[in-house]
Every structure is written in C-alpha cells, then in structure tokens.
C-alpha cells in the first residue's frame, strides 16, 4: 500500500453519516443517513428524475419521496441502500476513488458478526479498497478524549450504549444498550407540541421538530423544581422559534420535558432504565477493582448528549447511585457530537496502526471472516 494514500474515515450513524480524511480534526462531510425513493416514478415529463436520492438531496426533496433509513438502532438493516450511501459518500461527498485509500469504518457495540462480514465484503468487492478496518464507535470516542480507560456513554439518533473500556479493551459482558435515543426524543417532542395545539406529522415536519429540539432543549437539574418554575413563571422558560414559513411558535416547558425522557424513559412509555441507571449497571458488571477508574472517567459522546446541563445532571444522578465516598467525574468534550469520527481520524493516522489494516491480499486469502481476527 503506497505510503501517501491517506485513509478515509466513515462513521455510519443511524441519523447521520460523518466522513472525512484521517488526520483532519473534524469530518469533511456530514449528511443524513437517508435514502429517498420517488413516490410516483417519472410522473413529470421532461424532468430528469433519479431512481433514488441520498442524504441532503433526499432531505430537500422529501415531499415527493418515500424516505428510508438503512441503519436502524445502529445496525445496518438494508445492505443495498447502505451501499448507495457509501457510494454517495466516496464519489459525491468526499470525491475520492476508494480503490486508492484504506477505509476505516465504525460499528455499534454488540454488532452481529454477519454485519461486520458483510461490511468487509462490500468494501473489498464493490469498492475494491486496498485495505480496511472496522472499529467499535465507543472506543474511538474514548481515544478522542485522550483516554484508554473509562466508560463511554454514547447516545446518537438510533441507539444509546454504555460501554466500559479498560486499557483499550472493551468489556463486552458489561455493555448496556438501549434502543432509545434522539429519534425517540424527536417523536416525543412532536407529541408534546400536539398537546399545545401545534400539529407536526409528516416526515418533512419531523425535521423541523428535530431542529427545534436541537436548538432549544435543555436538561433540568431538578425536574420537579423546573416544572414548578415553568407553571409559576412561564416567561422564564419560554422561547420563540421561527418556522420555515415565517410563523413564530412559542416553546415552553417542552424545552426540558422532552430530554427528561433520557433519565425517565417511562415518560414516553418505555420500560427501559434511564441513562444514569444504564451507566451504573454497566459499571457494576465490571470487576470491583476497576470501578473507581470508571466512575472517574464517564465520557459522553454522540449528538443526543449535546443538551446543556447534561453533564451536571448525570454527575448528580451518579453520585446518588454510587457508594458514598466514590469520586464521580463526567467528561463532556465540546466536540462530542463528532468524537467517534475524531477518534477514527486519530487512530488511522497513527504509525503503529498501519500494521492493523486488513489488506486486500488477506481478504482474498481468508474471506470476510478475517474481520473477526483482525478487528476486535
């Protein structure tokens, strides 16, 4: 493999694909993991219509398309669509030839084995890459924060994980996974707006709600206290939001009621434990000797951890759960929305990592199962 070929780093999330070149400090392209198929093929004579649209283009034309997400809860469910997303990433977004660059892909923890094999197969057979590697998202987030031991609380659009890592090795028996993340909060926000008399129902309107959620929501340090405040002095929590058509709407207690579901999933009718309990249970599944280090290195990652005050609230909740003398430290890096990608960029540009790649020769010799031997 030529020395000068820079690796490509592609972080496939349920909501967004983050991609770019190894060594950069931020992804070059970020676009929604969406495929759009026209509802009425070729209805417009003389209009050039594609068979399918990917990413932002699908987002912009969503009125005439049926939208599909090939990655559900962090796991690829439709490989043909996934291949289209990768094709779009390489050729339209990054504008590179994949056969000239090694590619680092990311995967969810506890990913089915067949999924990793299929990823490997598509990279070598459809894109003809010279080398590739698959890394678990949480490890990359930890590397990006400059640590090798800690518990990563990664919450994106489709899935939330708590992953304990010791000296760079994931402890798989202690991973907790909840299929409750950003997308569920967006749906909950839509429901809260309905109660206020605003209706948002279509996929197009869902994107507006997602934007409101990302711009205006925050975590209450004390939920009951905040509710009381919002009832007594509404103006303290109210904010205005301008819709695309120019109308203004008022957003009030929804601002903290929506993300509260992270700590209390029963608000949205889910039986799973809250974020703090999931993290605590993960730590308790680990050896007693390393728990202290984990409590002291709780690293947040992913877009759904971007709410204001989430670090403080998590610290309070964990302090209540942990043994009295335990020191709790929550690390919330400002760039945590992209920390998986940043960790991938760091890892793939290390000189010591270059011998870790799965090469085309190794793949031709062993087939897709090589991924389990080389990527762990």
Curated annotation (Swiss-Prot):
ATP hydrolysis occurs in the polymeric state. Unlike for mammalian actin, ATP hydrolysis also occurs in the monomeric form and the release of inorganic phosphate (Pi) is more efficient. Pfam families: Actin (PF00022). Keywords: ATP-binding, Cytoplasm, Cytoskeleton, Hydrolase, Methylation, Nucleotide-binding. InterPro entries: Actin (IPR004000), Actin/actin-like_CS (IPR020902), Actin_CS (IPR004001), ATPase_NBD (IPR043129). ATP binds at residues 14-16, 18, 157-159, 213, 303. It is found in: Cytoplasm; Cytoplasm, Cytoskeleton. It is an enzyme of class 3 (hydrolase). Its main location: cytoplasm. Disulfide bonds: none annotated. The keyword ATP-binding applies. It catalyses: ATP + H2O = ADP + phosphate + H(+). Actin is a highly conserved protein that polymerizes to produce filaments that form cross-linked networks in the cytoplasm. Polymerizes into longer and more stable actin filaments compared to ACT1/actin-1. Has ATPase activity. ATP hydrolysis leads to the formation of a stable intermediate ADP-inorganic phosphate (Pi) actin, which is followed by the release of Pi. ATP hydrolysis affects filament stability; ADP-bound actin depolymerizes much faster than ATP- or ADP-Pi-bound actin. This is Actin-2. It comes from Plasmodium yoelii yoelii.
């Amino acid at each position: 493999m030529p020395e000068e070929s820079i690796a490509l780093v592609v972080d496939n999330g349920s909501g967004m694909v983050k991609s770019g070149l190894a060594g950069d400090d931020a992804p070059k392209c970020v676009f929604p993991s969406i495929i759009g198929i026209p509802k009425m093929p070729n209805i417009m004579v003389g209009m050039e219509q594609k068979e399918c649209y990917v990413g932002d283009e699908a987002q912009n034309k969503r009125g005439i398309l049926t939208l599909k997400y090939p990655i559900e809860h962090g796991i690829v469910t439709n490989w043909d669509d996934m291949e289209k997303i990768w094709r779009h990433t390489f050729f339209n977004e990054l504008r590179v030839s994949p056969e000239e660059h090694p590619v680092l892909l990311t995967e969810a923890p506890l990913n089915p084995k067949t999924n990793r094999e299929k990823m490997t197969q598509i990279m070598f057979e459809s894109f003809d890459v010279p080398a590739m590697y698959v890394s678990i998202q949480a490890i990359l987030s930890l590397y990006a924060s400059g640590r090798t031991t800690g518990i990563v609380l990664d919450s994106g659009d489709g899935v939330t994980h708590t992953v304990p890592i010791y000296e760079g090795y994931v402890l798989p028996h202690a991973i907790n996974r909840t299929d409750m993340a950003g997308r569920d909060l967006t749906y909950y926000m839509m429901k809260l707006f309905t109660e206020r008399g605003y209706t948002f129902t279509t996929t197009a309107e869902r994107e507006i709600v997602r934007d409101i959620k990302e711009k205006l929501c925050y975590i209450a340090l004390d939920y009951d206290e905040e509710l009381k405040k919002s009832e007594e002095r509404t103006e303290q929590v109210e904010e205005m939001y301008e819709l695309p058509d120019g109308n203004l709407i008022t957003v009030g207690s929804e601002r903290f009621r929506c993300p509260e579901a992270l700590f209390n999933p029963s608000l949205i009718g889910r039986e799973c434990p809250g974020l703090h309990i999931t993290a605590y249970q993960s730590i308790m599944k680990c050896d007693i000797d390393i728990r202290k280090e984990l409590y002291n290195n709780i690293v947040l990652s992913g877009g759904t951890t971007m709410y204001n005050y989430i670090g403080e609230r998590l610290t309070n909740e964990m302090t209540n759960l942990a043994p009295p003398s335990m020191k709790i430290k929550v690390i919330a890096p400002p760039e945590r929305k992209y920390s998986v990608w940043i960790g991938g960029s760091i890892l793939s540009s290390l000189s010591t990592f270059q011998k870790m790649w799965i090469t085309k020769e190794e793949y031709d010799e062993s087939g897709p199962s090589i991924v389990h031997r080389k990527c762990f």
